[in-house]
C-alpha cells in the first residue's frame, strides 16, 4: 500500500536571540515534499553565516509540542530512533531519515541554537 502524504517543512526561519548582536537567517529546503514509507528523506538547512555545529532539529505533529531529535548538528537525542541522523557544520546541514516510517510524517524544523557577535 502506497502511503503518499506530504511532509510539510518549514521554508524560512528567522531567529532572534536575547543579547545577540546579529540575526542569523536559516533557510530550509525543500519547503514541502511528498514521500512514501520506506523512502530515504533528506532535508537541508542553510545558515546565512557560519554557525559551527550549533544546530538542532525538531519534529512537530499537529496539536503536539515539538520533539527534539538532534542537537549539535549530528548528536541524536536520547530515545530518538537511529533512522534519524544529522550532519553538517558551518553553513550547510542535513537531516536524514534513512527509511521513512508512518509515524515520521510531520513538520521538521532546524533551529540555530547559538548566536555569534
Swiss-Prot record:
Record region (Framework-3):
79-110
Q: Which InterPro entries match?
A: Ig-like_dom (IPR007110), Ig-like_dom_sf (IPR036179), Ig-like_fold (IPR013783), Ig_sub (IPR003599), Ig_V-set (IPR013106), IgV_Light_Chain (IPR050150)
Span list, region Complementarity-determining-1: 46-56
**SMART domains documented for this protein:** IG, IGv
Region entry Framework-1: which residue ranges? 23-45
Q: Which UniProt keywords apply?
A: Adaptive immunity, Cell membrane, Disulfide bond, Immunity, Immunoglobulin, Immunoglobulin domain, Membrane, Secreted, Signal
Question: Which residues fall in a coiled-coil region?
Answer: none
Leader sequence residues: 1-22
What residue stretches are annotated with the Ig-like domain? 23-117
Q: Where is this region: Complementarity-determining-2?
A: 72-78
Q: Where in or outside the cell is it found?
A: Secreted; Cell membrane
Q: Which CDD domains match?
A: IgV_L_kappa
Q: Which GO terms describe its biological process?
A: adaptive immune response; immune response
Q: Which Gene Ontology cellular component annotation is one that this UniProt entry carries?
A: immunoglobulin complex
UniProt main location, coarse: secreted
Disulfide linkages recorded for this protein, renumbered to the chain, are 45-110
Framework-2, as annotated region: 57-71
Q: Where is this region: Complementarity-determining-3?
A: 111-117
Query: Tell me, what does this protein do in biology?
Result: V region of the variable domain of immunoglobulin light chains that participates in the antigen recognition. Immunoglobulins, also known as antibodies, are membrane-bound or secreted glycoproteins produced by B lymphocytes. In the recognition phase of humoral immunity, the membrane-bound immunoglobulins serve as receptors which, upon binding of a specific antigen, trigger the clonal expansion and differentiation of B lymphocytes into immunoglobulins-secreting plasma cells.
Subunit annotation: Immunoglobulins are composed of two identical heavy chains and two identical light chains; disulfide-linked.
- Spell out the protein name for this chain: Immunoglobulin kappa variable 1D-17
In which organism is this protein found? Homo sapiens (Human)
Q: Which gene encodes it?
A: IGKV1D-17
Amino acid at each position: 500500500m502506497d502511503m503518499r502524504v506530504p511532509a510539510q517543512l518549514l521554508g524560512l526561519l528567522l531567529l532572534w536571540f536575547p543579547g545577540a548582536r546579529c540575526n542569523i537567517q536559516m533557510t530550509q529546503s525543500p519547503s514541502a515534499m511528498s514521500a512514501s514509507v520506506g523512502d530515504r528523506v533528506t532535508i537541508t538547512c542553510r545558515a546565512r553565516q557560519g554557525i559551527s555545529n550549533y544546530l538542532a532539529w525538531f519534529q512537530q505533529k499537529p496539536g503536539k509540542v515539538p520533539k527534539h531529535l538532534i542537537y549539535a548538528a549530528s548528536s541524536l537525542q536520547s530515545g530518538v530512533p537511529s533512522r534519524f541522523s544529522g550532519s553538517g557544520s558551518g553553513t550547510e546541514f542535513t537531516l536524514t531519515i534513512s527509511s521513512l516510517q508512518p509515524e515520521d510524517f510531520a513538520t521538521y524544523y532546524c533551529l540555530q541554537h547559538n548566536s555569534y557577535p
